Curated annotation (Swiss-Prot):
Protein name (record): SAGA complex subunit Ngg1
Subunit comment: Component of the 1.8 MDa SAGA (Spt-Ada-Gcn5 acetyltransferase) complex, which is composed of 19 subunits tra1, spt7, taf5, ngg1/ada3, sgf73, spt20, spt8, taf12, taf6, hfi1/ada1, ubp8, gcn5, ada2, spt3, sgf29, taf10, taf9, sgf11 and sus1.
InterPro entries attached to this UniProt entry: Histone_AcTrfase_su3
Superkingdom field: Eukaryota
One term under GO cellular component: nucleus
Family: Belongs to the NGG1 family.
Species for this entry: Schizosaccharomyces pombe (strain 972 / ATCC 24843) (Fission yeast)
Annotated keywords: Chromatin regulator, Coiled coil, Nucleus, Phosphoprotein, Transcription, Transcription regulation
Span list, region Disordered: 106-144, 351-383
Length: 551
């Protein structure tokens, strides 16, 4: 090697492998090994992270040895080139001494230093976490199930009884920890894909979170030893599912053909007597018998001339039901919101202007009504001031205006109260639901005969399959018995030939059954279990529109 090549080799920087940056890993390891509270056992997640960092530091040792081996070869080649070019024997001896010194001192010293760095974090972890005497050469020996409990007590690993109150975890014992069954609890997004595969000892790892695909929450209790007292038997479970998976029969067709008359549900019963909250039954009976509401008078009585203030609390002088309702509709109804919204002008001015405007409106409307009525027919004689005549005149006027239809109203059977209005609204909704049920019943009635035919086809197929299976079992059983005995070939052939025609006839019957009837149910045989869409989709859309219209 020339002097220029030698200078170039000396000036070339040495490539330090990535594993030599062990100080960063040591800092990470120290940060993980520190516990918040002294004397508290860290969680299993922290322990596994510590072991993972230790494994990465220990793996640095082979790469360090490889690095020094390469440097040694470079130095030896450099020394050999110096020996060839140098003519001075003393310089050769100096170079050889330099190589020997580097071999003995520098290389071994560096390797020992790196080994001590990789071993010191492990000792510090055991001192901080376990705080118990170190088990000699426990990491080199195989851990058997017999000494798992001993190691658990010596290392003070977290178990269910200790971590259940502190960390909320449900780890069982040290065996689960050592076998790696708890690794799935510590893998998070901070690990790379290769680290996850290496940590879990698998060839592949799911790239997305698949916990949403798990059927429910996994059970964390131990059911291997103690059986729950309230566990439901399997027979009870099957019997509860039987009504949903049973076969159809003729009773189902008869049930669908039988209609349900719900017309009586739309009739609103007449109003009954008033309720009196009286405890003695005799007093209630007497009071109801003498009550004025038992035979309620709906006709107008009395006249305006004989009307005084004392008649307001009795039924001797009263207006007709139409007049009472019309007057009740003209009375203003004040609510709490109306009281809060006070007018900005004075109350007296507001009352005067309001009353004046109302009087003017009422006067003009009455004049218009009277003038309009004179155009059609003559009004009845109203010289008498009887309330019944006022009732008839009011009814006549409302009919002329088109507000009141022709026909007499039976006021004793009125149904315009709040309860009757609610009943009519519910009856309208009930009618919509009844129409929907009727359409669904007709749809099921049309599909049920085809389903029962396919059900019969499957039953016959299952029966033929069972007969063929029983024939084969019987044939094989007879052959096993014949093999145990010493028989001639003639006897064996006769035994097999006797069962063959039975099996052949069953197979022919099955093939003929499939050939004749399978094309009729090809769609049902090829489709998956269950229908992809509901058979009531069209009905539900139509019913929803009708329901919204009625409401």
């Amino acid at each position: 090697m020339s002097s220029e090549q030698q200078n170039e080799a000396d000036s070339k920087p040495a490539v330090i492998p990535q594993c030599f940056k062990i100080e960063n890993q040591y800092e990470t390891f120290s940060r993980l090994s520190e516990t918040s509270t002294p004397g508290v056992v860290p969680s299993v997640s922290t322990l596994w992270r510590l072991l993972f960092e230790l494994q990465k530091m220990i793996e640095c040792e082979p790469s360090c040895v490889e690095y020094f081996r390469q440097r040694k070869e470079e130095l030896e080649s450099h020394v050999d080139s110096e020996i060839e070019t140098s003519k001075d024997e003393s310089s050769v001896n100096k170079v050889e001494e330099k190589v020997e010194e580097f071999k003995e001192d520098n290389v071994e010293q560096e390797i020992k230093q790196k080994r001590s760095l990789s071993e010191s974090p492990q000792e510090s972890m055991l001192e901080k976490v376990s705080k118990k005497p170190k088990v000699s050469e426990a990491h080199n020996e195989e851990i058997s199930p017999e000494n798992v409990e001993t190691i658990e007590n010596e290392l003070d690993l977290p178990v269910k009884g200790k971590d259940e109150q502190t960390t909320g975890l449900v780890y069982k014992n040290a065996n689960d920890l050592l076998t790696g069954s708890l690794l799935s609890f510590i893998v998070d997004d901070s690990f790379s894909y290769e680290q996850k595969k290496k940590l879990l000892c698998v060839d592949s790892f799911p790239t997305s979170d698949v916990r949403s695909l798990v059927a429910g929450t996994p059970a964390t209790d131990d059911f291997s030893h103690n059986k729950p007292n309230n566990q439901i038997s399997i027979s009870t479970f099957y019997s509860s599912l039987d009504p949903y998976f049973r076969a159809f029969n003729d009773d189902d067709i008869a049930f669908l053909k039988k209609g349900f008359d719900v017309s009586s549900s739309y009739n609103i019963p007449p109003l009954g007597e008033r309720y009196y909250d009286l405890t003695p039954e005799d007093e209630m009976t007497n009071l109801c018998a003498n009550s004025i509401y038992q035979n309620l008078q709906t006709s107008a009585q009395g006249s305006l001339e004989a009307f005084n203030e004392a008649d307001t609390v009795s039924e001797e002088v009263r207006c007709g039901p139409l007049t009472e309702r019309l007057m009740a509709s003209l009375i203003p109804c004040y609510t709490q919101n109306d009281e809060e919204q006070k007018p900005s002008i004075a109350v007296g001015e507001f009352a005067e202007t309001d009353s004046g405007s109302e009087k003017s409106k009422i006067g003009t409307s009455i004049d218009g009504i009277e003038s309009g009525n004179n155009e059609y027919t003559e009004q009845p004689d109203i010289q008498e001031s009887s309330l019944s005549i006022c009732e008839d005149r009011l009814r006549y006027t409302l009919k002329q205006l088109g507000i009141l239809y022709d026909g007499d109203v039976d006021w004793s059977k009125r149904q315009d109260d709040e309860i009757s209005a609610t009943l009519r609204s519910l009856n309208a909704r009930l009618k919509v639901v009844s129409d929907e049920n009727e359409k669904m019943r007709n749809a099921l009635l049309q599909m049920l005969p085809e389903e029962m035919a396919f059900q019969e086809f499957q039953n016959v197929m299952d029966d033929l399959d069972k007969q063929i299976e029983q024939a084969y079992v019987k044939r094989n059983r007879s052959l096993k018995v014949k093999k145990k005995r010493i028989v001639t070939d003639k006897i064996g052939s006769s035994a097999t030939s006797g069962s063959f025609p039975v099996i052949k006839s069953l197979m022919d019957k099955r093939s003929m059954w499939l050939e004749k009837l399978q094309p009729l149910f090809q769609d049902k045989l090829t489709q998956h279990l269950g229908s992809p869409t509901s058979i009531f989709n069209d009905l539900s859309d139509h019913t929803t529109s009708n329901y919204s219209t009625s409401v």
